[in-house]
From Swiss-Prot:
The keyword Cell division does not apply. GO terms for molecular function: tRNA (guanine(37)-N1)-methyltransferase activity. S-adenosyl-L-methionine binds at residues 116, 136-141. It comes from Psychromonas ingrahamii (strain DSM 17664 / CCUG 51855 / 37). It is found in: Cytoplasm. Homodimer. Belongs to the RNA methyltransferase TrmD family. This is tRNA (guanine-N(1)-)-methyltransferase.
Length: 248
């Protein structure tokens, strides 16, 4: 997967390209990340990248020309690498990123992520160059770099070969609309707390059912809203009914 990033702070993305799952993906040539800094497209000695908004008000906007030229340079590089990249602007006004959204975006072989700063970006740039706007939540950050890194990490997990186990992405929280079940590792007893005996039984079917029940229970307790839009399987419906009966 090819990802271009337009950011005033490209060095921040070394956290993604040099570390963890995404760093390993870069090393294994499953992921390529390139950055463009709008400051490199300025013409004045101060490398100015902000400008006053029409109509007044607090704060500044990103200057149009350097940002536009940086996005166009990223699009050109994508084409030269054989990609037709989708341009995404990270914005609180965008569609909320979730598991399904990350999986959907992973189907693109190339993305260009625009990380804004200041009070935002000229609306005409968004209309002419941005294909989609995405948000990571209903809160405001100092810039789009952290949301861009969140999006990269979430999306790249779905790229074949990136995760160590083929089922890892399929069994994450939200993969089937539910929160994940509890997990345990050694030691068998920790501070007097025992690993659930079913996990030591070696009975794979019992373990599967236990994990399914635990996922339902955790979702019901912590995120009951997720159950409202979930089409339960017959098995899940029976397990959920049993949980509700036990709580009566």
């Amino acid at each position: 997967m090819w990802i271009g990033v337009v950011s005033l702070f490209p060095d921040m993305f070394r956290a993604i390209s040099d570390n963890g799952v995404t760093g390993r993906a870069v090393k294994n040539k499953l992921l390529s990340i390139q950055c463009w800094n709008p400051r490199d497209f300025t013409l004045d000695k101060h490398r100015t990248v902000d400008d006053r908004p029409y109509g007044g008000g607090p704060g500044m906007l990103m200057m149009v020309k350097p940002l536009r030229d940086a996005i166009l340079a990223a699009k050109k590089a994508a084409r030269e690498a054989g990609h037709e990249a989708k341009v995404i602007y990270l914005s609180p006004q965008g569609k909320r990123l979730d598991h399904c959204g990350a999986q959907l975006l992973s189907g693109s072989d190339a993305l260009i992520l625009v990380a804004g700063r200041y009070e935002g970006v000229d609306e005409r740039l968004i209309e002419s160059l941005v294909d989609e706007e995405w948000s990571v939540g209903d809160y405001v950050l100092s810039g789009g770099e952290l949301p861009a890194m969140i999006l990269i990490d979430a999306v790249v997990r779905f790229v074949p070969g990136v995760l160590g186990h083929v089922l890892s992405a399929e069994q994450d929280s939200f993969a089937d609309g539910l929160l994940d079940c509890p997990h345990y590792t050694r030691p068998e007893v920790l501070d007097g707390k025992q690993v659930p005996s079913v996990l030591l039984s070696g009975d794979h079917e019992k373990i599967r059912l236990w994990r399914s029940k635990q996922a339902l229970q955790r979702t019901k307790q912590r995120r009951p809203d997720l159950l409202n839009n979930l089409a339960l399987t017959d098995e899940q419906a029976k397990l959920l009914a049993a949980l509700e009966s036990d709580s009566d």
